Amino acid sequence: MDSNTVSSFQDILLRMSKMQLGSSSEDLNGMITQFESLKLYRDSLGEAVMRMGDLHLLQNRNGKWREQLGQKFEEIRWLIEEVRHRLKTTENSFEQITFMQALQLLFEVEQEIRTFSFQLI
């Protein structure tokens, strides 16, 4: 995994955890949880690509990995829409910068997952 992506995930998660969005903090915690889950999923796909022999293990262990991949893309699209919505509604520059970086990271991760999945298919 690219060390810039690791630091980006860590930076975004740290920044989001510092935000105080009042009644929507529960939603923000959900976004943070999904970001963490997405990072773990991306990492596991990347590792499987690095060890192509793991493809058979991955397929045997989880016969529904393509379905799972589709669900991850749905999660990414939901997160993108949620981040865009937050970006439009916030006037705080710290939050705007954080959400812009989160949006950029989501696009990068979506592309990386697509690349990994094509290599696995």
UniProtKB/Swiss-Prot annotation:
<protein>
    <recommendedName>
        <fullName>Nuclear export protein</fullName>
    </recommendedName>
</protein>
<keyword id="KW-0945">Host-virus interaction</keyword>
<dbReference type="GO" id="GO:0042025">
    <property type="term" value="C:host cell nucleus"/>
</dbReference>
<dbReference type="InterPro" id="IPR000968">
    <property type="entry name" value="Flu_NS2"/>
</dbReference>
<keyword id="KW-0813">Transport</keyword>
<comment type="function">
    <text>Mediates the nuclear export of encapsidated genomic RNAs (ribonucleoproteins, RNPs). Acts as an adapter between viral RNPs complexes and the nuclear export machinery of the cell. Possesses no intrinsic RNA-binding activity, but includes a C-terminal M1-binding domain. This domain is believed to allow recognition of RNPs bound to the protein M1.</text>
</comment>
<feature type="short sequence motif" description="Nuclear export signal">
    <location>
        <begin position="12"/>
        <end position="21"/>
    </location>
</feature>
<feature type="short sequence motif" description="Nuclear export signal">
    <location>
        <begin position="85"/>
        <end position="94"/>
    </location>
</feature>
<comment type="similarity">
    <text>Belongs to the influenza viruses NEP family.</text>
</comment>
<dbReference type="Pfam" id="PF00601">
    <property type="entry name" value="Flu_NS2"/>
</dbReference>
<comment type="subunit">
    <text>Interacts with protein M1. May interact with host nucleoporin RAB/HRB and exportin XPO1/CRM1.</text>
</comment>
<keyword id="KW-1048">Host nucleus</keyword>
<dbReference type="GO" id="GO:0044423">
    <property type="term" value="C:virion component"/>
</dbReference>
<keyword id="KW-0946">Virion</keyword>
<dbReference type="GO" id="GO:0039675">
    <property type="term" value="P:exit of virus from host cell nucleus through nuclear pore"/>
</dbReference>
